Amino acid sequence: MTASPSKLAQLRELSVVVADTGDYDAIKRLQPVDCTTNPTLVKKALDLPVYADLLERELTWGRAHGGDDRTTTVDEVADRLTIGVGVKLSALVPGRVSTEVDADLAHDTQATIAKARKFVAMYAERGVPKDKILIKIAATWEGIEAARQLQLEGIDCNLTLIFNRAQALACAEANVFLISPFVGRILDYYVAQGQTPASIDEDPGVVFVRTVYNAFKQRGSSTVVMGASFRSTAQIEALAGCDRLTISPDLLEKLDAEHGELPRKLSPGNANNAQITPIDSDSFASGLAADPMATEKLASGIDTFAKDLHALRKTIADKLAG
């Protein structure tokens, strides 16, 4: 008797599977279409033997170009390592690698645009075209406005830390390539408030992604919805059929080990109950202000990303000084 396909194999027939990791070996093993990086993943990746040559090469560059401005050198080495990891990963996946713009630029439109252009140029210098990468930007109003301009320049963006309908719709209005609503962090907030859902269909993170997906499909929006930040395989299964799902290696492994039918939960033809209203800066701000969960999670997410970036820079500074 032929074994039934794993749930991961079935999921791949319904959604584009993205690996939420920079772990070279895990990506080789699990074969996602896309992968994503951030400063924490880059920092972890630098401990892996496969990146040893990259690390040594960029530290050597940093020591040779140190000069008097140590902070600028450290920041530049961090950028070079981030792009170096992305270049290596781009050779493993047939699709895209998401690369994160500095979180401490989240409220600065022009600085975000400048850093995104710099990253695209750095990738190009290393032989990776811009259609192989996504520039990951926090979904503040300023970040969305930066993405609007970058999209006009042909630089595709992944707007992350999406917790609220106003954020999602503003991204669609800006013709952003892709958004990443954070399923697990939404659930975390409500569980911490003592509001544990009775079923997966009442999970607030799952409900939010379904609502956004339906709104985009009903609107005819080309913006890709990529569910992110999963806490369980049940959340992933509840969103089977979503455009893309970015999943950590441990949950990918669990899905690969599980069998049984995985039904489609989302499809463009079944999109319903989604009303579209235009979003400007005022309605964006009021939409966030009326949503304590989104306000808290967006701010804490940016803070966490910024701390992760500073931790990466500190690691580099220590290695340069060693």
UniProtKB/Swiss-Prot annotation:
EC number, as in UniProt: 2.2.1.2
One of the record's GO molecular function terms: transaldolase activity
Listed GO CC annotations: cytosol
Broadest EC class assigned to this enzyme: transferase
Active-site positions on this chain: 136
Reaction equation(s) it catalyzes: D-sedoheptulose 7-phosphate + D-glyceraldehyde 3-phosphate = D-erythrose 4-phosphate + beta-D-fructose 6-phosphate
Keywords associated with the record: Cytoplasm, Pentose shunt, Schiff base, Transferase
PROSITE patterns with a match to the protein in the record: TRANSALDOLASE_1 (PS01054), TRANSALDOLASE_2 (PS00958)
Annotated compartments: Cytoplasm
Entries under SUPFAM superfamilies matching the protein: Aldolase
Pfam families reported for this sequence: TAL_FSA
Predominant place of localization: cytoplasm
Gene Ontology biological process terms from the UniProt entry: carbohydrate metabolic process; pentose-phosphate shunt
UniProt pathway: Carbohydrate degradation; pentose phosphate pathway; D-glyceraldehyde 3-phosphate and beta-D-fructose 6-phosphate from D-ribose 5-phosphate and D-xylulose 5-phosphate (non-oxidative stage): step 2/3
Subunit structure: Homodimer.
Role, per record: Transaldolase is important for the balance of metabolites in the pentose-phosphate pathway.
Family: Belongs to the transaldolase family. Type 1 subfamily.
Protein name: Transaldolase
Gene: tal
